C-alpha cells in the first residue's frame, strides 16, 4: 500500500485557534491510525508547513506560538520546522520534549516564503502553455468591474477579455511592469470527490480566473498549496468545511498542471 501523508499548514498571522488545533489533531490522528490499520511496513507521515505568504501579517512570534502550542498539545509532526531538545520549553516549567520535525524525505523547506523560486518555475510553465496570464488591471478598474456586476445583479467573476493580447502582455511582463498572474480557467465543470460529503460538481461560473501570483511576487494561497501538496507527496487533505469552496479551484489547478509539461504528475489527493 502507498504511504499516507497528511499535513497541517497554518498561516502565522495570529494565535493557533481551536479550529486549527482540531484540524491538526485530525490530520495527526488519521496518519497514525492509517499506519496502524495497514500494519506491516506501512508508513505514515504528518507534516507541518507554514504558509507565510502574507508578509504584511505574518510574524516570527506567531510562528513560534503555533509550534509551541502544537508541541504542548502533544501533536508532534514528523516533518516540518525542527524544534525541541535542550532548552525548549513550550510553557513555563514544562520539560523540553524530544526534537520534533525534520526533513527525512528532503521535501522542504517548510516555510512558503522560502519556496518562491519553486513557485516561479511552475508559473513559467503555465505561462508557456497559456494556462496562466499576466493581468495589469488597476484597483480602480477592478472596483468598476465589481460595481458593474452588482448593478446587473450578477456575481462578480473575473475573466480574460476576448480582446486580450497575450504576446503584448508577456512583453510587458518581461519588461518588469507590475502585474498579477491569473489562472486561465478553461470554463469546464470541476468534480470533487469528498470522502465525507460524496461527489460534488462545481459549475464553471463558480470559478473565475483567480490570481496565482500577487504583484509583490508572492503566490496566493490557492497556488502555493497545490504546488506544495504535490511536491511534498500529500495523499490526504483533512480541512474545515469553510475550505470546501476552495477545493474546486485546487482541483482545476491540478488538472491544468497535469497538462503543463511539468516534471510532476499532480495527482489529486483524497479530500475530507
Model-derived features: where do they sit?
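Active-site cores that bind ATP or allylic diphosphates and position pyrophosphate for catalysis
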Residues: 86, 128, 133-270
